[in-house]
Amino acid sequence: MQQQEKGLKRGLSARHIRFMALGSAIGTGLFYGSASAIQMAGPAVLLAYLIGGAAVFMVMRALGEMAVHNPVAGSFGQYASTYLGPMAGFILGWTYAFEMIIVCLADVTAFGIYMGFWFPDVARWVWVLGIVFLIGGLNLCNVKVFGEMEFWLSLLKVGAIVAMILGGFGIMLFGIHSAGDTQASGLSNLWAHGGFMPNGIGGLIASFAVVMFAFGGIEIIGITAGEAKDPQRVIPKAINAVPLRILLFYVLTLFVLMAIYPWPQIGSQGSPFVQIFSNLGIGSAATILNIVVISAAVSAINSDIFGAGRMMYGLAQQGQAPKGFAQLSKHGVPWMTVVVMGAALLGGVVLNYLIPENVFLLIASIATFATVWVWLMILFTQVAMRRSMTQEQVAELKFPVPFWPYAPAAAIVFMLFVFGVLGYFPDTQAALLVGAVWIVLLVVAYLLWVKPAAGQAAKVHYDPALSHR
């Protein structure tokens, strides 16, 4: 812990952390991926966001219990090492970094698509390349610069979503509808096109692959514990605000969108938010919303690079990543991890140059696997921590999980169910395969390199003289 105080700078305030949690959770999954989820489930996608949101809140409370009890950078990777063993910590830490890289690939891809709204003739990879260099540079600055940027970008998103919800209600009241469309905007759109659950329970279940992707990154609150000024006060406040945010930013937003515009006409060419307002003939709103979804993508990329970098820093401190990852700049930023993330994102530039348009669902479903795996490990770690504690220690917890042990158990069952969803539907089976290969590679890497290295380190530190005392 002492080493931690000398290393990363505690430069993030309550304001920064609250908005970072928002920034990481409101991004490409909502502004772009929601179109795929709507096509799968129809208006019933609202139920999917409510159910998924409840499970995510339990993950956040489990993480919050551990982060308040022991705030460290690289948080849940280190917690897993402590309570489930070093291999579990290694797998969790690297899978989180993998999750952030894949989510980032989705975000930079979406950024290129959004820019195509204004510049349809410019190749998408050009925009992707530019944003990778810009965000990478910003993340090399002082952590406070990062926090400030995240605050203002998130504030813009929140303001725009609130304005869009109010505007949507206005459209419903005054009955504006798109050119050539005889169906006026209104609540009837939620059941007039095949009913509330047009694709049946199967469509609702299929949508979880994209819905859970939308929540990915919200666990960054735990990562910030090592750089929060007052973690025991700040983190509970940030986590307890999660349910309200899910209701407002996902459920209410999509409710308004599907009420003002027939859901079968919501396509995946660009953001559905921009498309709907453009088709309703409100061009200025479409332009403003495109600025907002671009800022949302930038904000999410920003959070992802921060989170993965801090996790790799924590792994390096435990000897589970190259030592260079623990090197700090004069600003107290783990610069090598930022460079590695930037290099990985250049792979996104290549992908956007080479691959077809329908790759977003594949990237999103791979990210869903990594995200849900991380959440499952967080839940298991919290259960292991509780089992290792005495009744007195449990009574002293400052931010305990509610409805223990039933709520965490229900969340664990739900996460396993999402893996089943990925494996069942043909469009997402590749994600389960990629995820399984990734986990196997990590187990092999741990057994071949990390474990022997840890054993060597233990031998070096062993002093025979001590054993004769």
From Swiss-Prot:
What's its membrane topology? Multi-pass membrane protein
Transmembrane segment boundaries: 19-39, 40-60, 100-120, 126-146, 156-176, 201-221, 246-266, 281-301, 335-355, 360-380, 403-423, 430-450
Q: Where in the cell is it found?
A: Cell inner membrane
Q: Name one GO cellular component term.
A: plasma membrane
Query: Disruption effect?
Result: The mutant grows normally on urocanate but shows delayed growth on histidine. The deletion mutant grows normally on minimal medium with glucose and ammonia and on minimal medium with proline as a sole carbon and nitrogen source, but not when histidine is the sole source of carbon and nitrogen. The deletion mutant is not compromised in its ability to colonize sugar beet seedlings.
The protein's UniProt keywords, in alphabetical order, are: Amino-acid transport, Cell inner membrane, Cell membrane, Membrane, Symport, Transmembrane, Transmembrane helix, Transport
Q: Name one Pfam family in it.
A: AA_permease
Biological processes per GO annotation: amino acid transport
Q: Does the keyword Cell inner membrane apply?
A: yes
Q: Which reaction does it catalyse?
A: L-histidine(out) + n H(+)(out) = L-histidine(in) + n H(+)(in)
The Swiss-Prot or TrEMBL record annotates one GO molecular function as: symporter activity
Explain what induces or represses this protein's expression. Answer: By histidine. In the plant environment, low levels of transcriptional activity are detected in the phyllosphere, rhizosphere and in plant extract, suggesting that histidine is present and available in this environment and can be used as a source of carbon and/or nitrogen by the bacteria.
Is Disulfide bond found in the keyword set? no
Q: What does this protein do?
A: Major high-affinity histidine transporter. Binds and catalyzes the uptake of histidine into the cell. Functions as an histidine:proton symporter with high specificity for histidine. Required for histidine utilization, but not for competitive colonization of sugar beet seedlings.
Q: Please state which protein family the record places this protein in.
A: Belongs to the amino acid-polyamine-organocation (APC) superfamily. Amino acid transporter (AAT) (TC 2.A.3.1) family.
Q: What is this protein called?
A: L-histidine transporter HutT
- The gene is hutT
